[in-house]
Each structure stands twice: as C-alpha cells, then as structure tokens.
C-alpha cells in the first residue's frame, strides 16, 4: 500500500491510499495547502492495530 498526494481540478491538495494493485482504498478531503494534506497523511500513518474502531 502507498499514499498519493495530488492537486485536484479545484486546486486543492488531496490524499488517497492505494493498494498494491493501484486501486484506491481510501481518500481524504481537500486541503488548501500541501503541508496540511501531508499532516493528515502523517496522522493516518501514526495509527496502529491497537487504534479502536467505534460504531456510531
């Protein structure tokens, strides 16, 4: 798996998580700066298997 950061048609930075076969698994909202988008990716990368899942 790997993350991609890209600029969309509206000029916002977005991230997407892709599987080894290059299919999109997850994607995030648009950010006005590349730094904020990278921060979101870094937060996701810091999660662990112990991170809880909550049903709402």
From Swiss-Prot:
InterPro entries: DUF1508, YegP-like_sf. Transmembrane segments: none annotated. It holds the Pfam family DUF1508. Belongs to the UPF0339 family. This is UPF0339 protein NMB1088. It comes from Neisseria meningitidis serogroup B (strain ATCC BAA-335 / MC58). The lineage of its organism: Bacteria, Pseudomonadati, Pseudomonadota, Betaproteobacteria, Neisseriales.
